[in-house]
């Protein structure tokens, strides 16, 4: 009975490990597909697991998996980032803050401040944020619909004249304020920044590129903060599933970034407007049917 009992325990633990890896693989794919498309990764990372019966993975788990997306965007834009760092270094050395790359770096720094301050405020003064009604299904559904309508309006009236080399600190601040709204589940960080950029007159592809670059500091900081808490609770068996989620998120995120930039060269954002409206309506209908039963 001893060896048999040990084998049963080993089999059970292996089964649990594989199940955890599968869950994180799915979460990583969902994260990768939705982080950089303007459709809200937070909303999908809450809805999809609940849809398949896994429950809400929580803020910490999703923030850690987001590190895979950060790895992807850093690799994809490594040349841009190198140029920005070089521009900032030259600006500090020679005072050349009017150079495009230096202005881009300054805009990213300024644009990061609103979400950084808002995130700190939530962490310090809203301990019940993760379980609050703002993360509920009806809230996510309504927010998704509202953001779809705003993106539609921006697509309709935005002049689309600005290009990346014209970016200023003021642009970073405006888009950064929109990025801070992404702390509300369903808003979508890429969606809010893309919408604000289109309202502000950016060309679609440049708006997307700036959105991706602007997200690097914010998502990295959020992931690192939650990573500290996650590691405090992490067991040895939890390392592999976590890595599976991060790697799958990185791979799919890279594909999503590449696809979106190419797509926006020749297409509008109407497909995302339609998707977000449909997503919001379906989630709301699901919640209503669930509460009526």
UniProtKB/Swiss-Prot annotation:
Membrane topology: Multi-pass membrane protein
An annotated Gene Ontology molecular function: undecaprenyl-diphosphatase activity
Compartment(s) of residence: Cell inner membrane
Family stated for the protein in its record: Belongs to the UppP family.
GO cellular component: plasma membrane
Function: Catalyzes the dephosphorylation of undecaprenyl diphosphate (UPP). Confers resistance to bacitracin.
Protein name per Swiss-Prot or TrEMBL: Undecaprenyl-diphosphatase
Catalytic reaction annotation: di-trans,octa-cis-undecaprenyl diphosphate + H2O = di-trans,octa-cis-undecaprenyl phosphate + phosphate + H(+)
Stretches that traverse the bilayer: 57-77, 106-126, 134-154, 172-192, 212-232, 239-259, 268-288
Gene Ontology process terms (BP): cell wall organization; peptidoglycan biosynthetic process; regulation of cell shape; response to antibiotic
Gene label: uppP
Species this chain originates from: Prochlorococcus marinus (strain MIT 9303)
HAMAP family per UniProt: Undec_diphosphatase
Matches recorded under InterPro entries: UppP (IPR003824)
Note: Bacitracin is thought to be involved in the inhibition of peptidoglycan synthesis by sequestering undecaprenyl diphosphate, thereby reducing the pool of lipid carrier available.
